[in-house]
């Protein structure tokens, strides 16, 4: 059995080593033309596009998504759910429609997986934001409406226990349509609706077993986090109240689930209170903007960014000027899932090992129990940069990460820069990276590690003309 598993892994590695110098690639059943000047998506990344971990009801990411959706919709079932968007989007959807400048670093090939010049793997769920705003605008006659998007997103990144080229985001929004006050009525109906919505959320918060304690010094608004002119002071006050209580409801729900699990298992240091705090922030699509942090295991942890929707976002979605007001939020599901389920290595989220998957059940937040700890094997790759390309950016760190990831996949636990040296006489620059080869479910032999290391070194020389040391 061990031999068969090893042979399958080795075969897969050699297949992944080949780069995508082909005229077409197929992703989710659709063929796309490639471009030798632009295409940088790899076989290893394409293989992840159909995993959809956020849709698996007994996977930590799927469990968390489901808990949040159900809790938010337990108030008045306002949110339309969008969880099935495919990961390939256009540059228009991912960047242009959201106002990204042409020189924005997020567009760089060093950060983004391009299929060709016009298509890429989405880098955020906001690529579908305008479409969802348009859907709730066209489908709803109610004063209040909203949506939730969850999806896998893709970014070229470093390799360590908390970073992976694919992760999962959730974002959501709520809007209210402005209405005029009836004759003889003090406030318009939409203002009454927001007040009632706030009361409903507060009632749910009061029913939680461990009550949430909130520290909020963002009120009144600060000069560096001002309101937008299209909203009145009353609208900002009520809309921000509803936003903050809704986000607090999410935090209270998932952390109460965690605390209940800790009590059941008689865990040490089970919290007796749940403290959160609001801090001022900046985001391109909201103003004013905030972040919420939770006090957990002796430190403040950032959980979610949010704010009141900028008017230009609503206008791009087809709403008329001053027709609506609302709020939006965004959070990373993987990071919170790793925290709540006590998962030490992000690679585990992608494991197909039943020893991992059978530990989790729909609707429950339980602690991951490690089933093995195999030793790592360190290898250094040191090289001189080409003499005619002394700038380190000629070999972007994310390019090195992609070479390693595409060859070794999840058999690499981390890659770290351990030395950078410029020769005092020649001026040549040398880099040294330390690779920790460590499987999550079996021991790697020295022969396997050496083969992987040789492949990495050969590919690095071939692609970037470096000189190995």
UniProtKB/Swiss-Prot annotation:
Transit sequence range: 1-17
Something else known: Present with 1800 molecules/cell in log phase SD medium.
Sequence positions that bind substrate: 126-129, 155, 162-164, 169-171, 302, 329
Domain FDX-ACB: 372-469
GO BP term, example: mitochondrial phenylalanyl-tRNA aminoacylation
Subunit structure: Monomer.
PROSITE patterns (alphabetical): AA_TRNA_LIGASE_II, FDX_ACB
A GO MF term: phenylalanine-tRNA ligase activity
Family annotation (SMART domains): FDX-ACB
EC number: 6.1.1.20
UniProt-recorded name of the protein: Phenylalanine--tRNA ligase, mitochondrial
GO cellular component: cytoplasm; mitochondrial matrix; mitochondrion
């Amino acid at each position: 059995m061990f031999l068969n598993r090893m042979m399958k892994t080795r075969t897969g590695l050699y297949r992944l080593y080949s780069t995508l110098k082909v005229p077409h690639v197929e992703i989710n059943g659709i063929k796309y033309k490639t471009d030798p000047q632009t295409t940088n998506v790899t076989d290893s990344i394409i293989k992840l596009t159909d995993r959809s971990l956020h849709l698996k009801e007994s996977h930590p990411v799927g469990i968390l998504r489901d808990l949040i959706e159900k809790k938010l919709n337990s108030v008045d079932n306002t949110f339309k759910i969008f969880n099935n968007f495919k990961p390939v989007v256009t540059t228009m959807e991912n960047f242009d429609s959201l106002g990204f400048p042409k020189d924005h670093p997020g567009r760089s090939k060093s950060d983004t997986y391009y299929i060709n010049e016009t298509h890429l793997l989405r880098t955020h769920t906001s690529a579908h934001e305008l479409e969802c705003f348009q859907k709730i605008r066209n489908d709803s006659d109610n004063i209040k409406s909203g949506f939730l998007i969850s999806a896998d997103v893709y970014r070229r990144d470093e390799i360590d226990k908390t970073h992976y080229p694919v992760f999962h985001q959730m974002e959501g929004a709520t809007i209210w349509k402005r209405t005029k006050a009836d004759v003889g009525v003090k406030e318009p109906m939409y203002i009454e609706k927001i007040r009632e919505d706030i009361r409903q959320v507060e009632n749910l918060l009061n029913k939680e077993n461990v009550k949430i304690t909130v520290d909020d010094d963002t009120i009144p608004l600060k000069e560096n986090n001002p309101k937008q002119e299209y909203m009145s002071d009353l609208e900002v006050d009520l809309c921000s109240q509803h936003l903050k209580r809704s986000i607090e409801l999410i935090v209270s729900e998932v952390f109460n689930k965690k605390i209940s699990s800790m009590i059941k298992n008689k865990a040490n240091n089970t919290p007796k209170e749940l403290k959160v705090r609001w801090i001022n922030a900046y985001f391109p699509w909201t103003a004013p903007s905030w972040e919420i942090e939770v006090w957990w295991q002796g430190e403040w942890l950032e959980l979610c960014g949010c704010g009141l929707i900028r008017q230009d976002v609503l206008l791009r979605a087809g709403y008329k000027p001053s027709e609506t007001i609302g709020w939006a939020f965004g959070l990373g599901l993987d990071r919170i899932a790793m925290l709540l389920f006590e998962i030490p290595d992000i690679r585990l989220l992608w494991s197909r090992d039943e020893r991992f998957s059978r530990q989790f059940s729909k609707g429950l937040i339980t602690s991951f129990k490690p089933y093995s700890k195999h030793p790592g094997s360190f290898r250094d790759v040191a090289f001189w940069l080409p003499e005619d390309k002394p700038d380190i950016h000629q070999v972007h760190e994310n390019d090195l990460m992609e070479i390693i990831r595409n060859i070794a996949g999840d058999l690499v636990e981390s890659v770290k820069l351990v030395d950078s040296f410029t020769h005092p006489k020649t001026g040549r620059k040398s880099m040294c990276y330390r690779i920790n080869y460590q499987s999550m479910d079996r021991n790697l032999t020295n022969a396997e590690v050496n083969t992987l290391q040789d492949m990495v070194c050969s590919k690095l020389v071939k692609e970037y003309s470096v000189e190995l040391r």
